[in-house]
């Protein structure tokens, strides 16, 4: 998972978290 692209499939809030790296 890089940049939160994969996480978009999980949940929107998590996408932001991974995108920021937190």
From Swiss-Prot:
GO terms for molecular function: serine-type peptidase activity. Coiled coil: none annotated. Optimum temperature is 35 degrees Celsius. Active from 20 to 70 degrees Celsius. One of its GO terms (biological process) is proteolysis. It comes from the Eukaryota. Detected in skeletal muscle (at protein level). Transmembrane segments: none annotated. Optimum pH is 9.0. Active from pH 5.0 to 11.0. One of its GO terms (cellular component) is cytoplasm. Residues 1-22 form the Peptidase S1 domain. Its EC number is 3.4.21.-. Serine protease which degrades the myosin heavy chain and tropomyosin, but not actin. Selectively cleaves Arg-|-Xaa bonds. Belongs to the peptidase S1 family. This is Myofibril-bound serine protease. It comes from Saurida undosquamis (Brushtooth lizardfish). The lineage of its organism: Eukaryota, Metazoa, Chordata, Craniata, Vertebrata.
């Amino acid at each position: 998972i890089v940049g939160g692209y994969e996480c978009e499939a999980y949940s929107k809030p998590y996408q932001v978290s991974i995108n920021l790296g937190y």
